[in-house]
A protein has these predicted regions:
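N-terminal Rossmann-like NAD(P) cofactor-binding subdomain of oxidoreductases
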Residues: 1-205, 236-237, 309, 315-316, ...
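Charged docking surfaces used in two-component/phosphorelay signaling
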Residues: 187-361
Length: 361
């Protein structure tokens, strides 16, 4: 690929925006040329706008330090500099919906980390290994928006990445009822311990809106396209509790599953480790070679050992055992700001590019 596609990051100064910038450093297909944020950051260099709030483990890439932050509300101006944008803006749901559609209407594809459009019927919400065929609704969305190349695609909530991939791998055994509890890292709230000290040695048994997303979003991902919109699946029915725990990165899930065709442990493990999707077939730059690993040890997966499996793009499953009430239970772990946020969105963009939806303007 000769020319890299020019990328803009909307909401570039926040934690997910920073993760986009660090993940896209030296990307073989994409180059960050534009950073946009709130009017209060506009006009400053990216380095000055972020100041002491850089939250990544790796240093700020030199290539973005001197980029002048643009005002995210100046849609035409920002859009004129890029081939597509990643959206991680921090606004109200209605404002996000409006601004993402405004960018799409400038013929600029939007790959969003935000939840605002996850239930817009003709907007695909995609985990690329699971439901890349949902990108087909984009043509219907373009008709609605009146665009030729502009559209919105979104990635799902970070909480579901620790159990939805396993349930997808087990589809042939017909899971129909799932109970899950997620133990979610503070970076999911855009925080570190430095700016959320009350989370140290603490657990908060509530994360606003998270349980509804964790129960409903997998059903949309497993849904079918009918008449140009995505109709959610009816099963498996999921009930979920979401807990904030004093961990920086990594969402863990404890899940219990009932199957119509109860499998053996060997069948379940085989289905997990053999599960592949379009990103693996196409060998996309951010795709994990192994999407799901199974760990036999009783004390795995652990955040410290396993959260960075496949550079944070893989999912780790362990403790698979028969249950007294349900058929099987397991523990899952995924990296909430890589696979669960910016990394998942970058993989969506790579899939969209490989399938011809995103091209140079």
């Amino acid at each position: 690929m000769s020319e890299k596609l020019r990328v803009g990051i909307l909401g570039a100064t926040g934690m997910v925006g920073q993760r986009f910038i660090s993940l896209l450093e030296n990307h073989p297909w994409f180059v960050v040329v534009t950073v946009a944020a709130s009017p209060r950051s506009a006009g400053k260099t990216y380095e000055d706008a972020v100041g002491g709030r850089w939250k990544m483990d790796t240093p700020m890439p030199e290539a973005v330090k001197k980029l002048v932050v643009m005002n995210v509300n100046e849609v035409e101006k920002v859009a004129s500099t890029v081939d597509f944008v990643f959206s991680a803006v921090d606004m109200s749901k209605d404002e996000i919906k409006a601004i993402e559609e405004a960018y799409a209407k400038t013929e600029t594809p939007v790959v969003s980390n935000n939840s605002a459009h996850r239930w817009t019927p003709d907007v695909p919400m995609v985990i690329p290994e699971i439901n890349p065929e949902h990108f087909e609704v984009i043509k219907h969305q373009k008709e609605r928006l009146g665009t030729k190349r502009g559209f919105i695609a979104v990635k799902p909530n970070c909480s579901i990445q620790s159990y939805a991939p396993a349930l997808t791998a087990w589809k042939e055994f017909e899971p129909y009822e799932v109970v899950a509890t997620t133990y979610q890292a503070i970076s999911g709230a855009g925080k570190t311990f430095k700016d959320w000290p009350e989370m140290e040695h603490n657990i908060i048994p509530y994360i606003g809106g998270e349980e509804e997303k964790s129960e409903k979003e997998p059903l949309r991902i497993w849904g079918k396209i009918e008449d140009g919109v995505i109709v959610p699946a009816k099963e498996p029915v999921i009930t979920c509790q979401c807990v904030r725990v004093p961990i920086l990165n990594g969402h863990t899930a404890a899940a219990f599953v009932k199957f119509r065709k109860k499998p053996t442990k060997e069948q379940l493990v085989k289905a997990l480790v053999e599960f592949k999707g379009v990103p693996q077939e196409l060998n996309l730059p951010s795709a994990p070679k192994q999407f799901i690993q199974y760990l036999e040890e009783d004390n795995r997966p652990q955040v410290t050992e396993d959260v960075n499996f496949e550079n944070g793009m893989g999912v780790s499953i362990g403790r698979l055992r028969e249950d007294t009430v349900y058929d099987w239970k397991f523990i899952g772990l995924s990296h909430n700001t890589v696979r669960g946020a910016a990394g998942g969105a970058v993989l969506c963009a790579e899939t969209l590019k490989a399938q011809g939806y995103i091209q140079a303007k």
